[in-house]
Design a protein with these regions (language model features):
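Conserved, single-site charged/polar hotspot
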Residues: 2-407
């Protein structure tokens, strides 16, 4: 036993010695992050919002601004109301603060009921009832209980007062002009839609889409663009339950609480004005900054041309140029060519700084080569725009003369 134990000790010592003399294991190399430089913020079609401000600083009128960004269009008129889905209200019904003269309209019959007053009643609610019906209930602040007031076979809406306070799931109150309608979109719960005049709607849009401190001509241009955008989508949503959402997927809308004196003035100064092409409302797209050139679209009034106003001095544009980094793993996942060896822009528009907006991007990796559109890269890497370059890559080619095959 003793000899075996000694032998085991000797063998163990030899292994330790051999291990100590072996070369240390080299840490696996980590692929570096990818640096991406760019210009602008958004798709670049239609009006640059910072460009409109730059043009206003340069002394251009609202008409000159709109003529530049929507060439070939004419001024028209529009009135009426708009239906906006309120995304922040994720409850099963529509809950509002109780105020005098608040009413409920039965949308099936058109009849309006004035809600009763009560000293301790401080909330009203429209909730689902039966098959596609609604019920209206009140909340008593003293007893802390809900009491059923009336049932309806169809949808209903609160109306009758200048401003109604919508109670959100967080308990916060957001005020809206017009009516607050309950609609059944999914069959599972009721969504909230604000039915409001077009002009009052714009009062809640313009200060959310532009800075209220901007020059009057820039704010007026934003008002006309937003009004036109609304009317265009309204004309295509007649059979739907709402016309627009209230987020960046449509136009940002904050209701009454977002209104500012300067933007209300801009809306009033352009009351009813929209832009037409061949007698019809245009797709009045706009984005924060086009980087120095407008982007071409699928309609005649969305053209590719240089824009000297986007980076105009004192416009305050923070996205004239920008630089970001993305982890190597994230970039590799986008292109799916293994370890990235090179990234380069293959084609550009040829208009604007650095050869213009990128059109296609090539990645060469350990598993091959892949070409994506610049918009695909923008979306998948969460970039501010598709006007991009890869400054650390010696293979980046800004020339508009290089095609998708690299020739």
């Amino acid at each position: 036993m003793k000899k075996r134990a000694i032998a085991a000790v000797v063998l163990s010592s030899a292994l330790i010695s051999a291990s100590a003399q072996a070369s240390p294991v080299e840490p696996k190399a980590t692929a570096p992050d990818t640096t991406i430089s760019g210009r602008g913020f958004g798709h670049g079609r239609g009006m640059s919002q910072y460009g409109a401000q730059g043009a206003a600083i340069a002394g251009k009128s609202v008409r000159q601004i709109l003529d530049f960004y929507y060439p070939g269009t004419a001024t028209g008129k529009a009135t009426g109301s708009i239906r906006v889905r309120i995304s922040a209200d994720t409850t099963d019904g529509v809950r509002v603060g109780a105020v005098d003269h608040l009413g409920v309209r039965d949308l099936a019959t058109g009849k309006v009921y004035t809600l009763p007053k009560a000293s301790t009643r401080n909330q009203w609610s429209i909730d689902p009832y039966g098959d596609h019906g609604t019920k209206v209930s009140s909340f008593d602040a003293k007893t802390r209980k809900w009491t059923l007031w009336k049932t309806f076979t169809g949808m209903t809406q609160f109306e009758g007062v200048a401003v109604t306070g919508l109670i959100l799931p967080t308990g916060a109150v957001r005020r809206y002009r017009g009516a607050l309608r309950a609609i059944d979109l999914s069959g599972a719960h009721l969504d909230t839609v604000n039915v409001v005049s077009l002009e009052y709607y714009l009062r809640g849009v313009v200060p959310r889409e532009a800075l209220s401190t901007w020059r009057p001509a820039a704010l007026q241009a934003q008002a006309v663009a937003a009004r036109t955008y609304s009317v265009f989508h309204r004309s295509r949503a007649a059979r739907k339950a709402y016309d627009l959402c209230d987020t960046t997927s449509c136009q940002v809308y904050g209701g009454y609480d977002s209104e500012k004196a300067s933007t209300n003035t801009a809306v009033a100064a352009t009351a009813g004005q929209i832009r037409l092409y061949q007698g019809k409302p245009i797709i009045a797209e706009f984005s924060s900054s086009n980087g120095g050139a407008t982007a071409a679209g699928e309609v005649p009034y969305q053209v590719l041309k240089a824009d000297g106003w986007d980076a105009y001095p004192d416009s305050g544009n923070p996205n004239v140029t920008w630089t970001v980094t993305r982890p190597a793993a994230e970039v590799q996942a986008v292109f799916d060519v293994g370890s990235i060896r090179s990234l380069r822009v293959l084609k550009r528009t040829g208009v604007g700084p650095s050869g213009g907006r990128a059109l296609t991007v090539e990645a060469v990796g350990s598993k091959g080569r892949r070409v994506l559109t610049a918009d695909q890269v923008r979306i998948r890497l969460h970039l501010r725009s598709g006007w991009i370059a890869f400054p650390v890559s010696p293979l980046d080619m800004p020339s508009a003369l290089v095609d998708d095959a690299g020739r």
